[in-house]
Amino acid sequence: MTLFMGGRLAIMTMPYEVIAENGFRDGDLGTLIDVARSVRGVEVAAVVKQLTAEKKFRASLRSSVDFDVAEVAAEFGGGGHTRAAGCTILAGSIDEAAEKLQNAITARFE
């Protein structure tokens, strides 16, 4: 997990290699977002997962403040609600996907 914006944003990544080696399924990873949200000071949390070897990355976003994560998800063709949303990010690597998400969030954060 990496913290940004003085600890207000937390982004966790789960690469395909880790998922495949451990036999995880998408449903097994649902509580990761809660780990990121539990860090003191985190207002927006995201988990980026690579579920297959393809260069498609699924992101889950949550907000504990008046920050519309659905707007961020919509930028990548996703959707959801103000405080809970998701999307698929196309990128060359999981780090690139996380960086795209970080940039989209920080651009909207006040």
Can you name each region flagged by the protein language model?
Residues 1-76, 81-110:
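Hydrophobic helix-and-loop "lid/oligomerization" segment in the mid-to-C-terminal part
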